[in-house]
Curated annotation (Swiss-Prot):
It is an enzyme of class 2 (transferase). One of its GO terms (biological process) is tRNA wobble position uridine thiolation. ATP binds at A6, M7, S8, G9, G10, V11, D12, S13, L32, G125. This is tRNA-specific 2-thiouridylase MnmA. Residues 149-151 are annotated as: Interaction with tRNA. The record marks H126, Q340 as: Interaction with tRNA. It is found in: Cytoplasm. Its EC number is 2.8.1.13. The active site is at C101, C199. Belongs to the MnmA/TRMU family. Catalyzes the 2-thiolation of uridine at the wobble position (U34) of tRNA, leading to the formation of s(2)U34. Keywords: ATP-binding, Cytoplasm, Disulfide bond, Nucleotide-binding, RNA-binding, Transferase, tRNA processing, tRNA-binding.
Length: 365
């Protein structure tokens, strides 16, 4: 096959490309340039798409003897990821820009151009697996074998079309073995640290970034009884479950810590309460993505709401036509925010199967 290797400049994508070459595919490496501002992400080594990362990706491709290109997706990245991030916080949501980037840029946009240029698939360094069912139908997306690095959650926002054109060569390997393989191949990125920062906020100050783009939208912090505690500069400064930075002078009557339990962007009201007030038992989600035929109607499954969070079993009611689902949790979750992805899994001894996902729009205690 003719495959496009998405080269982030890290060790995982390097080994993924190497394995694709070893498998006999015709491989071309591509690094995505995502920043319109050369003073931010392009010069930072903390993100996943800096100038240093591009140079690392080129060196790997040179080592493998495959062509290497840099594609400028900065306009689409700004529109689909950065602007969406800002808009979501402005309405009281807590988005995950890395999931959004996977959905809109690293797969949808990359595949769109790749297929137009005659490529059959995109190969990435994500820790997830695709397995073919016995009847030879469409492949299933499963968790990677390394529980500490599994990235099936961040891929749960993809559509079936993207999954059909993906290859995840490192999903059946644990991270230490990937580093050993990279070292044996002579890749300079063998010991390169993983990146976790939001690439377009290289200094890590999310509040300052949002404040610059959203501006002052004053509102009030209140307790569970509606008592006003202090004014704030905007709901974008808060997320569900937040404890630090509330700057409330008067302590709670019972002396317990306060957490953000609700955000009403329309009124600018931020409600705080105890950890107990964070517990929710029902999740409503829309903007559904379907990766498995079992994601329909009434099903028992598991749900994960954070990239590195645990799973909770639930009873799901899924209406494909209405683009909506309700998840009744078998045990409560804490700190679940609107805008997060709820990814559904079907437990399986060979690796949990990703059924699909939805974007959380409402929760109930």
């Amino acid at each position: 096959m003719r495959v496009l290797a998405a080269m982030s400049g890290g060790v995982d994508s390097a080994v993924a490309a190497s394995r694709a070459v070893a498998a006999g595919h015709e491989v071309v490496g591509v690094h995505l340039a995502l920043s319109q501002d050369p003073q931010t992400v392009r010069e930072s080594s903390r993100g996943c798409c800096s100038l240093e990362d591009s140079a690392d990706a080129r060196r790997v491709c040179d080592k493998l003897g495959i062509p290497f290109y840099v594609w400028d997706f900065s306009d689409r990245f700004k529109e689909d990821v950065i602007d969406n991030f800002i808009d979501s916080y402005a309405i009281g949501e807590t988005p995950n820009p890395c999931l959004r980037c996977n959905e809109k840029i690293k797969f949808a946009a990359l595949l769109e151009r790749g297929i137009a240029l005659g490529f059959d698939a995109v190969v990435t360094g994500h820790y997830a697996r695709l397995t073919q069912p016995a009847d030879g139908g469409d492949g299933y997306l499963r968790r990677g074998v390394d529980p500490n690095k599994d990235q099936s959650y961040v891929l749960g926002v993809l559509g079936a079309h993207e999954i059909e054109h993906c290859m995840f060569p490192v999903g059946d390997t644990i991270k230490p073995e990937i580093r050993e393989e990279a070292s044996a191949a002579g890749f300079s990125v063998a010991k390169k640290p993983d990146s976790y920062d939001i690439c377009f906020i290289p200094d890590g100050n999310t509040q300052a970034f949002l404040g610059k783009h959203i501006g002052m939208r004053p509102g009030m912090i209140v307790d569970q009884e509606g008592t006003q505690l202090r004014e704030h500069a905007g709901v974008h400064e808060f997320t569900i479950g937040q404890r630090k930075g509330l700057d409330i002078k008067a302590p709670a009557a019972d002396g317990r810590p306060r957490y953000v339990t609700d955000i009403d962007a329309k009124t600018g009201t931020v409600t705080v309460g105890t950890r107990e007030n964070l517990k929710i038992s029902t999740i409503h989600a829309d903007r559904l993505k379907f990766l498995h035929p079992a994601m329909d109607g009434q099903i028992d499954c598991e749900v994960q709401v954070r990239a590195h969070g645990g799973v909770v079993s639930c009873s799901a009611t899924i209406d494909r036509d209405a683009d909506f689902m309700v998840l009744n949790l078998n045990e409560p979750l804490q700190g679940v925010a609107r805008g997060q992805a709820a990814v559904l899994y079907l437990p399986d001894a060979d690796g949990d199967i990703v059924l699909g996902s939805g974007t959380i729009c409402h929760t109930e205690s």
